Amino acid sequence: LLAEMGGRLRAYRAAAITPRLFILQQLPHAGWPLVWLLSLVNVALGLLPVIFVVATSVLIGRVPAAAAAGTGSAEWGALVSAFVVASAVFLAQQMLTPLQATLGELMQHRVNGYFHHRLMSVAMRSTGMAPLEDDTTQAAMQQASEMLQTAFRTPGHAASGMLAYIARYGRLLGLAVLVGVVGSWWWALLVLVATMAFRYGQRGATMRMWVRMWTALSAYRRERDYFRDLGLAGATGKEMRVFGLTGWVGERYRDSAVEALTPVWAQRRRYMLYHFLWYTAFALLADGLVLALMVRTAATGQLGLTGLAMGLQATIGAILLGEYYPEADANTQFGMGAVSALEDFDRRVAAYPEPAPAADPTVSAAGLPAHTIRFADVSFTYKGATRPVFDGLDLTLRAGERTAVVGLNGAGKSTLVKLLARLHEPDGGAVLVDGRDVREFPVDAWRRQLAVIFQDFNRYELSVTDNIAFGAIERTAEPAAVRSAAGKMSLLPALDALPRGFDTPLSRQYTDGADLSGGQWQRLAIARALYAVDAGARVLVLDEPTAALDIRAEAAFFDELAEVTRGATTLLISHRFSSVRRADRIVVLDRGRVIEDGTHESLLADGGRYAELFRLQAERFEADPYADLADDAHDEPGRERIW
């Protein structure tokens, strides 16, 4: 029995006490002057109702004598004095209540600002991508983000809610003292127990149940929200209507909403019966007993009119404090849930080891590679996967050479880029730069030598200049250099025609904003990489750079690219074999290993895997020359093809 009680106490401490103590520790983020001022306001709001009960009770007790003595008498003056005090206290409450709300809102913004900053810091803390590519970590991040962004359950609301309890529980203690003064102290104790039982039935276990349910059903809510957004988003409307999906999406939205709410309804019925009704019945019986004893005492003449009025008001006021506190209860409970979600996300990110810092953090990687980059006996497996991506990979990239890496999906092409950029670290072997392990350089120093554009490159809803200049964030954006990078990608006519030229935000959601076609976005992303090369990056990495282009546009594109990247160390990743024939050297990956290495002509002459796949793709194009043409840019208003 003792062990069971100890376990329950530990569980209660973990669920109710520890999170509240943590919330209190966050109050300094709001600033101590604000904390003390809001605390004093809450103390006043706790004491003033008690004083009001005393003043009105005295007022009631003086009515008979004042009525008998008449106006102008000392008794009438005492009655008026009690009325003035009660009125002043009432007015003070009315003035302090909006002040409490205003100061509480200010505290919420300040504390929430700290936690939003912390969420961003945790999400961006890792130098690699491993934590953010893990499904459970992603789910934890989405849960924390969702709970931090919802208006009524943020840590800031929890912080202001914790201070709001000062007013509520201060008033409860004051009213209990009044009950003890006019009656007996066991009456006061019974009133306190009854009120807290009422509180537990109204809020305690019930509110914790809501938080647990809310957290457990997060996946269902995300599915519901996905179908809602799918139905409301303009970008998805065309295809949904063409394929007749609108009715299906509406049904899925309703089904997912019902699926999310059904467990909530069941739990609500259970808690309403076993918690709310039983605890409420006990509280009403206990307070009814106190009220009956109070009236009986007054009937025997042992309690006067003032004492009876004070006792009745204090007892009824106390039981009313057993209700739900809108300014504190949900705010605190859900706010603690938001903090717990953020802590869970933090723990999951921290579970991934960071790369060991460079022995000399001041060492520079500028000018590297001068000779080679070598993947030396590299092995790598994604977390949770059973098959390694690389197992003994040995590949050398020569400085100043354009090397293309081709292979079927799953061959490890994109993973090669991630290892080169140190977004992941090899499980075995090493990436050597001019013979030195890349881990000898600080991560940021090495990445400044890389200009990488991934297949799923970022489309920043910012100006054209920002979208290009982000290639070298440490360099002040120079208009001439930005225009030069755009010009190398033949973008100047299209960009100059935008409403605000290079200052145009690339989103139609903004005033004078505009959007680009898929091919234009791809060229803009490569212009970002070329801007980085102009700023000093030595290695240009292009992962599927022509995914949004048709074959004819692709051929013209690579002719241009060959000119603007001449002399740079270039790594080109592609699944289209026709797009890499202009490379100085072609490497074929299969199952994480290099199986062929040579020029386009030599690999065709060898008749190996490259020749086989190249001819398969060539035969497809010869059979249907338009099979790979992409004409999406022609039908979008305001978009033009520029190649």
Place the predicted regions along the sequence by residue.
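ABC-fold ATPase nucleotide-binding domain signature/coupling loops
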Residues: 492-524, 528-545, 549, 624-629, ...
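Cytosolic ends of transmembrane helices, especially the final helix of ABC transmembrane type-1 domains
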Residues: 311-348
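Extended non-transmembrane interhelical loops and adjacent amphipathic helices
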Residues: 1-21, 109-156, 220-263, 336-347, ...
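Transmembrane helix-loop-helix hairpins at lipid-water interfaces of multipass membrane proteins
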Residues: 36-99, 169, 173-207, 285-306
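An intracellular "coupling" helix at the cytosolic face of ABC transporter transmembrane type-1 domains
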Residues: 29, 145-158, 232, 241-285, ...
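Conserved "ABC signature" C-loop
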Residues: 457-510, 531-538, 609-612
